[in-house]
Amino acid sequence: MDHEIHSFIKRKLKGVGDVWFSYFMMSKNSTSQPYIISNYPEAWMKEYIKKEMFLSDPIIVASLARITPFSWDDNDIVTLRAKNQDVFISSVQHDISSGYTFVLHDHDNNVATLSIANHLEDANFEKCMKNHENDLQMLLVNVHEKVMAYQRAINDQDNPPDNSRNALLSPRETEVLFLVSSGRTYKEVSRILGISEVTVKFHINNSVRKLDVINSRHAITKALELNLFHSPCEPVVMKHMDAR
């Protein structure tokens, strides 16, 4: 997937010339290692990650407080660089000294950036960035959407949903739906379980919502398909019936 996204970014950046780029994504809630897709020199990327430079990188620090694109030569960036020169001094050794960064903050409290380095020292670089600002910002949005979708898919594989009876419906919801499926009225169910008819309807409505159907009949059909009326609920139901 990283290779696909790398190729996607590279293809979309053809219009702005032969540039180095870096997509960076990190949670604002933790200092865990960021997710990076880049064609920066490999030696620089290894040093950047090994020394955890992202924690003090002036570009990332600035991105945390901004929502609009910015040049690395902006006054506030220059000021941040002066306060923390280690990252800049190291990056210059790899021909990364000027560039432009696009910023995105998502609903999961992540910050994502698309940084484009002017490693060829093109005099028209900044003008080119400004001319393509909207397209490049949308590129960041599209890339970030792909990355998050990919990570969600991986997470779903690692943590598959629990489709057991108890994961879908509570024991009481299963009891109520089981009794209704056997042809009993809400009044009869309320008497068997010792609850009010209002509570019976409440549990039925919850079952309909959780099973993502439109009414109780459909809920019963889906519950049967999913084998939710498995034996665990039946002894409980029988206990209530015997107590009548």
Curated annotation (Swiss-Prot):
Residues in the DNA-binding region annotation: 186-205
Iron-sulfur recorded as keyword: no
Gene Ontology molecular function terms on file: DNA binding
Domain of life: Bacteria
Keyword Transcription: yes
Domain HTH luxR-type: 162-227
Swiss-Prot/TrEMBL GO biological process terms: antibiotic biosynthetic process; quorum sensing; regulation of DNA-templated transcription
CDD domains per record: LuxR_C_like
Classification via InterPro entries: Sig_transdc_resp-reg_C-effctor, TF_LuxR_autoind-bd_dom, TF_LuxR_autoind-bd_dom_sf, Tscrpt_reg_LuxR_C, WH-like_DNA-bd_sf
Functional note: Functions as an OHLL responsive transcriptional regulator which acts in the control of the biosynthesis of carbapenem antibiotics.
Alphabetized PANTHER family for the sequence: DNA-BINDING TRANSCRIPTIONAL ACTIVATOR DEVR_DOSR
Family: Belongs to the autoinducer-regulated transcriptional regulatory protein family.
Protein name: Transcriptional activator protein CarR
Species in which this protein is naturally found: Pectobacterium carotovorum subsp. carotovorum (Erwinia carotovora subsp. carotovora)
